[in-house]
C-alpha cells in the first residue's frame, strides 16, 4: 500500500478502535521518509500506545524531511519526526524548532553505485540520488562523497528522487549512477551486482522528535505524553519482535523474510535506537561541523541549543524507563 502524502492520515491501526474517546488529544504528526527511522512513531500508532497515553495521532508522510519541517513550522503538524540536519538548519535560520526525543542516533546509509562503477573516480560526471535537498540523505551523500575524495558540487550532480524505494528504483533503472541507501537496501543492491562504495557511520542525529518552543509553552502536557509514548514504543520494538515485524511490513511493504529479519535487528539495536531516547549531542555536533563549512552561524552554535531534554529527563529521573525494562511490560 502506498502512503498518502501531506494532509491525510495513511494507515488504520492494526488493532481496532471503534470510537475516539472525547478526552483524547487529536493532532497530526508528520514524518519525512519511508524508513525505519520512524519505527517508534509507527509502533506507537499501531500498538495503541498513543491512545493509552491520551493521544489520537494521525500520521502523515511528507516527501522528504525539508517538507516535513515546513509543515511543522506552519503548525500543520505540531510535532514531527524529522532528520537532525533539518532541525539544525531550521533553528539556525531563526525558527523556534527544537528536538525533544532522540529517535535514531547513528547514521545508517551507504553510497551505492551501478555495477559498472567500482571506483570513486568513475563516478565523476554522474548523478547521485537523494530524497530532497537539505534532508538527511542529501546531507549524508555530501559526507560520503567527501570521504571518497570527490567534490559534491563540482564532481557530481546531486538529484532529488524521493524515498529509499524511489532511489533504489532509479539506480536499478540506470536513471542515476549512485544513490544513498539504508543498510538493508544496500545489501539487497549488492546481491544484484551493485557496489557499496562507502558507508557514513558515526554518531549522527539521523531522526528525532521535533516540535516548536511555542507548542511546548502552549501544550506541555501533550508534549510530555508524546515523549512518554516514544519511550514506550521503543521498548515495545525491543521486546515484541512479531509485532515489530508486522508494523514494518505494513509501512515498508512486502519483503522477504531474510531482509525483514535483518531490517528489524538493525533497527532495534541499542546503539541505533537507545532505550532512553536522549538526543545525541555528539551527533548534532557532527552536523554542525559539516554545516560550518558554508554557514558561519553553525560555527558559533552549541549542540545544546537545538534540544529540550526536560521531558526525557523527567521520565528518566523518575525511574520510569528503568522500571519499564526491568518489568518487561508491554
Could you describe each region identified by the protein language model?
Residues 43-44, 109-118, 206-221, 272:
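A bilobed periplasmic-binding-protein/Venus flytrap-type ligand-binding module shared by bacterial periplasmic
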Residues 219-301:
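Secondary-structure end/capping motifs
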Amino acid at each position: 500500500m502506498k502512503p498518502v502524502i501531506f494532509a491525510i492520515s495513511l494507515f488504520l491501526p492494526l488493532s481496532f478502535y471503534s470510537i475516539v474517546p472525547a478526552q483524547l488529544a487529536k493532532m497530526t504528526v508528520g514524518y519525512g521518509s519511508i524508513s525505519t527511522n520512524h519505527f517508534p512513531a509507527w509502533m506507537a500508532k499501531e500498538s495503541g500506545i498513543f491512545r493509552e497515553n491520551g493521544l489520537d495521532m494521525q500520521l502523515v508522510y511528507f516527501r522528504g524531511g525539508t517538507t516535513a519541517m515546513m509543515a511543522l513550522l506552519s503548525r500543520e503538524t505540531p510535532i514531527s519526526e524529522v532528520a537532525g540536519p533539518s532541525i539544525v538548519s531550521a533553528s539556525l535560520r531563526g525558527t523556534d524548532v527544537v528536538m525533544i526525543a532522540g529517535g535514531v542516533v547513528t547514521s545508517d546509509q551507504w553510497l551505492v553505485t551501478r555495477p559498472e562503477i567500482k571506483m570513486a573516480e568513475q563516478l565523476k560526471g554522474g548523478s547521485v540520488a537523494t530524497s530532497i535537498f537539505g534532508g538527511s540523505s542529501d546531507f549524508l551523500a555530501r559526507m560520503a562523497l567527501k570521504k571518497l575524495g570527490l567534490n559534491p558540487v563540482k564532481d557530481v550532480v546531486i538529484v532529488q528522487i524521493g524515498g529509499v524505494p524511489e532511489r533504489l528504483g532509479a539506480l536499478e533503472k540506470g536513471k542515476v549512477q549512485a544513490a544513498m541507501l539504508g543498510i538493508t537496501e544496500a545489501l539487497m543492491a549488492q546481491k544484484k551486482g551493485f557496489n557499496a562504495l562507502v558507508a557514513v557511520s558515526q554518531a549522527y542525529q539521523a531522526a528525532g522528535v521535533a516540535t516548536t518552543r511555542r507548542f511546548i509553552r502552549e501544550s506541555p502536557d501533550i508534549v510530555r505524553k508524546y515523549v512518554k509514548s516514544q519511550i514506550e514504543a521503543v521498548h515495545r520494538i525491543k521486546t515484541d519482535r512479531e509485532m515489530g515485524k508486522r508494523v514494518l511490513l505494513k509501512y515498508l511493504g512486502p519483503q522477504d523474510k531474510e531482509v525483514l529479519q535483518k531490517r528489524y535487528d538493525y533497527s532495534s539495536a541499542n546503539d541505533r535506537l537507545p532505550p532512553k531516547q536522549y538526543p545525541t549531542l555528539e551527533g548534532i555536533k557532527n552536523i554542525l561541523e559539516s554545516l560550518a563549512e558554508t554557514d558561519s552561524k553553525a560555527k558559533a552554535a552549541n549542540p545544546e541549543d537545538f534540544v529540550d531534554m526536560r521531558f526525557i529527563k523527567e521520565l528518566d529521573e523518575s525511574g520510569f524507563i528503568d522500571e519499564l525494562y526491568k518489568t518487561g511490560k508491554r
